[in-house]
């Protein structure tokens, strides 16, 4: 009976749970799904991480290549993110060129990188005007059950912290790059941006970490990205219901709390990887 009602009237079915301050999956309105991260998942990548947010699963692989610095910024390198949402992760997506949702997600990640200054692009310069690192960050969604932006941001951060680049010098006689694979160093991660997403129901009610079904039924969504200093790095709201100043402040306060949880989880994972 309940399954039939959910199929015929999914929103009304959902509202009955919201009235009791809970959700069909058993969570409270402000409760996040179980979050896990595995670092170094791809042996052939220069850095990688696998993040699970409930059923939503994203893997990030980073490959470092040489490139010429931009002419207008000869002392900078590049960080190039790309989010892939294939039919593998959800039947909603099709093979071929990136769809709108994938393009929006890629631009969101690019904005997070730029606004948070997670990496100073000057740190990627090898020789000013001649050679720089290009970090290709491929974020592949393996299972899409909502809140893809939070999962992608977490996977990117963990993968960047996992990157190790070899020492590179320019031979003055030959003007060629010489790579010392025996001497590698980690990236200098300047900030730790963490995304926290919300869904708005009936223009007023906020829930955190929405599933795919919740995103579909919601009247709006919002993603807030904060760093460890409590600074707002990015705010993403693709239309939908408006929010009052008080609601927005509530979202930012919850995002600060969520940042501490994610940062603690990531610190524990990287601490466990260090040789004793």
UniProtKB/Swiss-Prot annotation:
| Single annotated GO MF | mRNA 3'-UTR AU-rich region binding
Instruction: List the source organism.
Output: Bos taurus (Bovine)
Subunit? Component of the RNA exosome core complex (Exo-9), composed of EXOSC1, EXOSC2, EXOSC3, EXOSC4, EXOSC5, EXOSC6, EXOSC7, EXOSC8 and EXOSC9; within the complex interacts with EXOSC5 and EXOSC6. The catalytically inactive RNA exosome core complex (Exo-9) associates with the catalytic subunit EXOSC10/RRP6. Exo-9 may associate with DIS3 to form the nucleolar exosome complex, or DIS3L to form the cytoplasmic exosome complex. Exo-9 is formed by a hexameric base ring consisting of the heterodimers EXOSC4-EXOSC9, EXOSC5-EXOSC8 and EXOSC6-EXOSC7, and a cap ring consisting of EXOSC1, EXOSC2 and EXOSC3.
Task: Give the record's keywords alphabetically.
Answer: Acetylation, Cytoplasm, Exosome, Nucleus, RNA-binding, rRNA processing
What does the function comment of this entry state? Non-catalytic component of the RNA exosome complex which has 3'->5' exoribonuclease activity and participates in a multitude of cellular RNA processing and degradation events. In the nucleus, the RNA exosome complex is involved in proper maturation of stable RNA species such as rRNA, snRNA and snoRNA, in the elimination of RNA processing by-products and non-coding 'pervasive' transcripts, such as antisense RNA species and promoter-upstream transcripts (PROMPTs), and of mRNAs with processing defects, thereby limiting or excluding their export to the cytoplasm.
Q: Which family does it belong to?
A: Belongs to the RNase PH family.
Keyword flag Aminoacyl-tRNA synthetase: no
Q: Which CDD domains match?
A: RNase_PH_RRP43
Pfam entry (one): RNase_PH
Q: What positions are modified (N-acetylalanine)?
A: 2
Q: What is this protein called?
A: Exosome complex component RRP43
Give any Gene Ontology cellular component: cytoplasmic exosome (RNase complex)
**Superkingdom of this protein's organism:** Eukaryota
> What PANTHER family does UniProt report for this protein, alphabetically?
EXOSOME COMPLEX COMPONENT RRP43 (PTHR11097:SF9), EXOSOME COMPLEX EXONUCLEASE RIBOSOMAL RNA PROCESSING PROTEIN (PTHR11097)
